[in-house]
From Swiss-Prot:
Heme chaperone required for the biogenesis of c-type cytochromes. Transiently binds heme delivered by CcmC and transfers the heme to apo-cytochromes in a process facilitated by CcmF and CcmH. The chain crosses the membrane at residues 8-28. It is found in: Cell inner membrane. Pfam families: CcmE. The gene is ccmE. Keywords: Cell inner membrane, Cell membrane, Cytochrome c-type biogenesis, Heme, Iron, Membrane, Metal-binding, Signal-anchor, Transmembrane, Transmembrane helix. Residues 29-148 are periplasmic. Signal peptide: none annotated. This is Cytochrome c-type biogenesis protein CcmE. Residues 1-7 are cytoplasmic. Residues 128-148 are annotated as: Disordered. SUPFAM superfamilies: Heme chaperone CcmE. GO terms for biological process: cytochrome complex assembly. It comes from Pseudomonas aeruginosa.
Length: 148
């Protein structure tokens, strides 16, 4: 093989390898990409069916239903305009409660029910873990001792 043909073959092989590597990386990004939607966007049909995405909003008051003795839970997420029903099987975060912010990740089925695989409770910037709050409360209850 002539040096020129060998050089062309190496360039073609290198470009092919680069193209394949780029395609694999883009495919990995595409499969791990999780979009965020509001309940209004989900109700309007903007969210994909049978594909993982996130929905954020408030847990509607009075919508939380638990099965006795099971981890299954149903609730409704709203953005004050539209609401979507959610079902989840697992342990809910400690901060999860009605009227509070939540982000759920999962899939929307053809019946319009969001089947959550993960539930994340949102909190405000003033949140403090209960242990830390208790420690601060105890310190504030003790009389301040002054040094001379």
């Amino acid at each position: 093989m002539k040096p020129r043909n060998r050089r062309i073959a190496l360039i073609v092989a290198g470009l092919s390898a680069l193209g394949i590597a780029t395609a694999l990386v883009l495919n990995a990004f595409q499969s791990n990409l999780v979009f965020f939607f509001t309940p209004s966007q989900v109700s309007a049909g903007e969210a994909p069916l049978e594909r993982t995405f996130r929905v954020g909003g408030m847990v509607e008051r009075g919508s939380l239903k638990r099965q006795r003795g099971e981890l299954a839970v149903q609730f409704v997420i709203t953005d004050t305009v539209k609401a979507i029903p959610v079902t989840y099987s697992g342990i809910l975060p400690d901060l999860f409660s009605e009227g509070k912010g939540v982000v759920v990740q999962g899939r929307l089925d053809s019946a319009g029910l969001f089947r959550a695989e993960e539930v994340l409770a949102k909190h405000d910037e003033n949140y403090m873990p209960p242990e830390a709050q208790h420690a601060l409360d105890e310190v504030q209850k003790k009389p301040a001792s002054r040094k001379p």
